[in-house]
């Protein structure tokens, strides 16, 4: 997954070093740190939006209440901060016992290779997680000898994610534009909006990954689920090439939008998070991003959510997505009691009870709701749940492109501004992605 959210409790680098130094001094002074106790769990998560954080705090309190004597020592970090610090912290012995970790070669794959994560297959059997989530979803947390999608399972996620098309019903209605049913209709709608002086798309490319999601979502909407094998092979490191006509055409279209005035003015200087807030305030007709923004988007009742409309001839279009960062147990869980407590914690985080709590807060749970659950669903979440059911039924849940290599996210982030500004061609953009991927395949051999 490639999303970034605003921080609520992030230590600057100098404070992190100071905290580590103080922790080391405490160990020397007292011989045994609190983090070493089996009943004291250091947990890192990426739930840094206010609504998400409130859910995690509630679930943590409930877990502590059900396990007297257990204390959750929580640290919340943004996606990008997690990528920068997690592997180093666990390697140094200063990290969490339980953590969220991004699937894919750059994070989970690298940590598994270095022995920094523990397999959770025993807990899958013990708690029946394979009854709560499909095997195709759990496969996104499997690694074996550098191979993605096979072997032992190293995590499980609590939230489902879909990248789709947010739209502002009022703006579209005032402009006399109907919701598009096909990709061709979407293109026509964008032209109508632009002619009326309305920014067709909200966009922010200064920080975060809105452009990446836009390119990936458009490309995968043009892939029928019956033809997904090529994409699966790319993501799971089995081979192939990013240098395809479909990827080039998607990059070309997004570049044309950027150069042709289809994006909100000044998008180059706006971060992805700020672009979302502008969209919520009523700026822009459409925005392509993921369900992780449901909690914020629900504050504007005019905002709806739908799949990227498929082009004619595609009956089961794919959607970028899958699940949020996985809950995992690190190698810092040294003892069996600590590992078992970590397993119990993760079980609660992916339970039907937790799923209902997330749903009540407006977020899309990866675990199916219990038959007798009666959450208060927002219109956005209702749309998301129906999309989730359809995508899973059609085997059309796609992938985040950055999962395909350890360095792909950086490669895409470095080159997307160049693509949008017209400083590189769509062909060069895709070629850069493919060179990154081919180098990764070569290094794996």
For the regions a protein language model found, what residue spans apply to each?
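Conserved N-terminal structural module of periplasmic/extracytoplasmic solute-binding proteins
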Residues: 23-25, 36-116, 125-132, 179, ...
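Extracytoplasmic/periplasmic substrate-recognition and gating elements
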Residues: 61, 65, 92, 151, ...
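Hinge/lid segment of periplasmic solute-binding proteins
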Residues: 105-163, 213-214, 305-306
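Extracytoplasmic/periplasmic solute-binding protein
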Residues: 145-158, 163, 187-239, 284
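Glycine-centered hinge/linker elements that transmit conformational signals in sensory
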Residues: 190-193, 232-267
């Amino acid at each position: 997954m490639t999303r970034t959210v605003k921080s609520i409790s992030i230590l600057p680098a100098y404070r992190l070093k100071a905290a580590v130094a103080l922790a080391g001094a405490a160990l020397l002074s007292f011989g045994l740190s609190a983090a070493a106790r089996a009943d004291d769990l250091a947990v890192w998560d990426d739930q840094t939006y206010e609504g998400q954080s409130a859910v995690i705090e509630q679930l943590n309190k409930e877990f502590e209440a059900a396990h007297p004597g257990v204390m959750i020592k929580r640290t919340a970090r943004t996606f990008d901060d997690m990528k920068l610090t997690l592997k180093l912290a666990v390697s140094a012995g200063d990290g969490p016992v339980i953590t969220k970790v991004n699937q894919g070669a750059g994070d989970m794959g690298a940590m598994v290779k270095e022995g920094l994560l523990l397999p959770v297959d025993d807990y899958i059997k013990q708690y029946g997680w394979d009854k709560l989530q499909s095997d195709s979803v759990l496969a996104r947390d499997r690694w074996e000898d550098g191979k993605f999608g096979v072997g032992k399972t190293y995590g499980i996620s609590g939230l489902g994610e879909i990248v789709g098309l947010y739209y502002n019903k009022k703006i579209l209605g005032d402009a006399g534009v109907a919701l598009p049913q096909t990709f061709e209709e979407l293109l026509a709608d964008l032209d109508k909006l632009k002619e009326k002086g309305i920014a067709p798309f909200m966009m922010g490319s200064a920080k975060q990954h809105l452009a990446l999601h836009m390119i990936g979502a458009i490309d995968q909407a043009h892939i029928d689920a019956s033809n997904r094998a090529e994409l699966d092979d790319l993501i799971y490191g089995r081979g192939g090439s990013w240098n395809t006509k479909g990827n080039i055409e998607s990059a070309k279209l997004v570049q044309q939008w950027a150069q042709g005035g289809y994006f909100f003015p000044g998008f180059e200087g706006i971060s992805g998070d700020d672009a979302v807030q502008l969209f919520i305030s009523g700026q822009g007709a459409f925005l392509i991003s993921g369900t992780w923004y449901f909690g914020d988007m629900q504050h504007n009742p005019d905002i709806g959510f739908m799949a990227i409309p498929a082009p004619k001839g595609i009956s089961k279009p794919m959607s970028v997505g899958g699940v949020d960062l996985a809950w995992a147990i690190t190698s810092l869980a040294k003892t069996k009691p600590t590992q078992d407590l970590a397993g119990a914690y993760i079980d609660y985080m992916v339970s039907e009870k937790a799923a209902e709590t997330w749903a009540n807060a407006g977020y899309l749970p990866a675990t199916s709701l219990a038959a007798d659950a009666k959450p208060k669903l927002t219109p956005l979440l209702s749309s998301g749940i129906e999309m989730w059911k359809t995508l899973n039924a059609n085997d059309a849940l796609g992938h985040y492109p950055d999962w395909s290599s350890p360095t792909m996210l950086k490669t895409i982030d470095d080159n997307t501004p160049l693509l949008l500004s017209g400083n590189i061609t769509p062909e060069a953009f895709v070629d850069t992605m493919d060179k990154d991927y081919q180098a990764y395949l070569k290094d794996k051999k």
